[in-house]
């Protein structure tokens, strides 16, 4: 007769031979890739940040129309001989901007504005290459985390669209016999607006990759809905103000009225509605465009205070600090905007004003992110 089966001993012995469970193994497997992708996105963020600044300087130096053709590939090489430089100069001499306002230019002067525009376009090519190499590398090595293929591809598509919109903008100013000396302001606003959208998505993805997927899932459960909703509204309102700022830059409206708080001694400028049909004034009248930018700024800072009052009620220190940073940056931006007007929008102040707009934009995104994914702290504050 066989001996009784030692059921519990056999089970215990079998269990002893199995490897111990390792919690978080799947997350650890992808953590290295998440960190690498985050570094790649941080590089892209820095490049786009610089691109926005260079684009602003290109506009402020009236360099944007110096290259009259769009050659995405062959245009990567600048003129390499005197004959090539002469050819580029002759193309520029044929457009209205030169004939109307820049006939004084010699070759040396033309080269200055040409290098600004060439550098702006070249930086765009560099951004495209950095995106393509990074995306291709992670794709081939199968290191893209689940759910991220579409997000990273979307950035590339936005970048391609930005290049096309850039030429669409420039083409509006490369005219002959039409009396046009600048690009269309609404196209400039579209171009700048998309740049902020691209930068915003990159910043958001960087913040997402800065924390593990389980951590984000856990944080989502303690989402602060009021702060999230109000910061979303502030983000959209700020974007509107950025577009209005682009309209101001597009028609040099910042130099049309240099007093504050009034405009030419009036609360509402007398030149605001002089164009026909009337809708043109909202895009082309320096008086009305600057007036809209000013009034929107006043309302925006008031709304920022309201959002901050709600944000400071958050139970999470990191979230409260994020809203404090938003209020501080927005206040500084309003003050800088007034200074820009009073000094007639000189290039160095105007570019600082635009750069600070980027910082405000990112800080609002961070406050919104922390409202949706709070960083929980213990009673001890750790």
UniProtKB/Swiss-Prot annotation:
Requisite cofactors: heme b
Catalysed transformations (reactions): Fe(II)-heme o + 2 A + H2O = Fe(II)-heme a + 2 AH2
Paired cysteines (S-S): none
GO cellular component: plasma membrane
Keyword Membrane on entry: yes
Its biological purpose: Catalyzes the conversion of heme O to heme A by two successive hydroxylations of the methyl group at C8. The first hydroxylation forms heme I, the second hydroxylation results in an unstable dihydroxymethyl group, which spontaneously dehydrates, resulting in the formyl group of heme A.
Official protein name in the record: Heme A synthase
């Amino acid at each position: 007769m066989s001996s009784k089966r030692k059921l519990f001993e056999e089970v215990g012995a079998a269990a002893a031979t199995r490897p111990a469970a390792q919690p978080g193994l799947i997350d650890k497997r992808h953590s290295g890739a998440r960190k690498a992708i985050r570094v790649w996105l941080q590089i892209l963020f820095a490049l786009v940040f610089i691109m926005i600044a260079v684009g602003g300087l290109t506009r402020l130096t009236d360099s944007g129309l110096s290259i009259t053709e769009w050659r995405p590939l062959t245009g990567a090489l600048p003129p390499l001989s005197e004959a090539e430089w002469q050819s580029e100069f002759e193309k520029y001499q044929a457009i209205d901007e030169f004939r109307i306002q820049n006939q004084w230019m010699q070759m040396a002067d033309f080269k200055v504005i040409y290098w600004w525009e060439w550098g702006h376009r070249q930086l765009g090519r560099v951004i495209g290459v950095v995106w393509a190499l990074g995306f291709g590398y992670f794709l081939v090595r199968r290191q893209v985390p689940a759910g991220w293929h579409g997000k990273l591809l979307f950035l590339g598509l936005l970048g391609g669209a930005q290049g096309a919109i850039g030429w669409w903008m420039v083409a509006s100013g490369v005219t002959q016999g039409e009396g046009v000396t600048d690009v269309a302001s609404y196209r400039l606003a579209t171009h700048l607006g998309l740049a902020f959208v691209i930068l915003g998505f990159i910043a958001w993805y960087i913040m997402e990759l800065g924390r593990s997927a389980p951590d984000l899932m856990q944080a989502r459960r303690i989402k602060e809905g009021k702060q999230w909703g109000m910061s979303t509204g502030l983000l959209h309102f700020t974007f509107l103000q950025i577009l209005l700022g682009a309209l101001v830059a597009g028609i040099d409206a910042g130099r049309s009225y240099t007093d504050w708080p009034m405009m030419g001694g009036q609360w509402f400028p007398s030149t605001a509605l002089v164009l026909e049909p009337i809708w043109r004034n909202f895009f082309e009248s320096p008086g009305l465009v600057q007036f809209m930018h000013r009034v929107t700024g006043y309302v925006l800072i008031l709304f920022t205070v309201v959002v901050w009052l709600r944000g400071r009620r958050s139970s999470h220190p990191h979230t409260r600090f994020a809203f404090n940073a938003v209020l501080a940056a927005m206040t500084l931006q309003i003050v800088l905007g007034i200074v820009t007007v009073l000094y007639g929008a000189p290039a160095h102040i105007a570019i600082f004003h635009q750069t600070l707009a980027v910082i405000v934009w990112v800080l609002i995104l961070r406050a919104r992110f922390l409202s949706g994914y709070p960083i929980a702290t213990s009673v001890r504050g750790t």
